[in-house]
Amino acid sequence: TVGGKLADEQQVLCQIAIAVLESVNATATDQCSVGGTDATRQALLGGDIDLYWEYTGTAWVTFLGRKPIQDSKAQYEAVKQQDLIHNNIVWLAPTPFNNTYAFAIKAERAQQLGLRTLSDMAAYIRSGQPGNLCIEPEYQNRDDGFPGLQRAYGFEVPAGRLKVLQAGPIYQAIADQKECLFGEVYTTDGRIPELGLTVLADDKLYHPLYNAAPILRKQIYDRNPNIAKAFAPISAALTNEVMAELNRQRSAEGRSPRRVARDWLGQHGFIANGS
């Protein structure tokens, strides 16, 4: 039984997992909409589902209560080892994509202003030039969110220039360039390519790393160790650009997660075309 959280990305990843399992003749039951992070994790630990995709940073910080590690390989190896020791959970190969917090700007504005990194953004804000910065409520108060970002990059946004919006509307507001010059986004969101935005590089590596990997209970893995080999090339192919494009097909074009997943797998020869 394959589970997933409710976000578009999780729905697409869940359908990828089902198709991969079927391609190695395993029977996969679709439980792709379990709920939020905690509910999905509990479903795995309790045996209601056997496999789902989790993010390294989420498991390390939220489930294991540790401080983020700012190297994606080291973060993955640490969470893989500790989750197995403490919870009997096996982590399969991780994705290169990292769905973390970031700041974006309209691509042509970034070029005009010569902005490539968050250090560039901080310098621009310190110089007092016009333009608001938009963030979502949760990010505003999280210690690993905005307060820490301003400390890490040494800038402070004047009260009148900081706008707090819900996560969804921020993308369009950056594209419109009226309310927001800069906005907080998630790196693999499909609206980034759809709306012509560009993500500023986190050159001081402030934000936690959220690489994804399929995870499953050890007893299931021990019965089907060949699953690891089936997933490895697929995880490896899921870069930020690929994941954002699959998310875009889901969010902007309204395609079903199943079709998005199977078309991509088929095009790249991971499964038979048209299956």
Over which residues does each language-model region extend?
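Extracytoplasmic "Venus flytrap"
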Residues: 1-15, 33-36, 138-141
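Short, polar/charged alpha-helical segment
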Residues: 8-27, 147, 151
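An extracytoplasmic/periplasmic, membrane-proximal ligand-sensing/linker region
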Residues: 9, 140-144, 148-152, 225-275
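Beta->alpha turn/N-cap motifs
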Residues: 36-37, 47-60, 75-76, 167, ...
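Ligand-binding "clamshell"
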Residues: 63-92, 177-181, 191-204
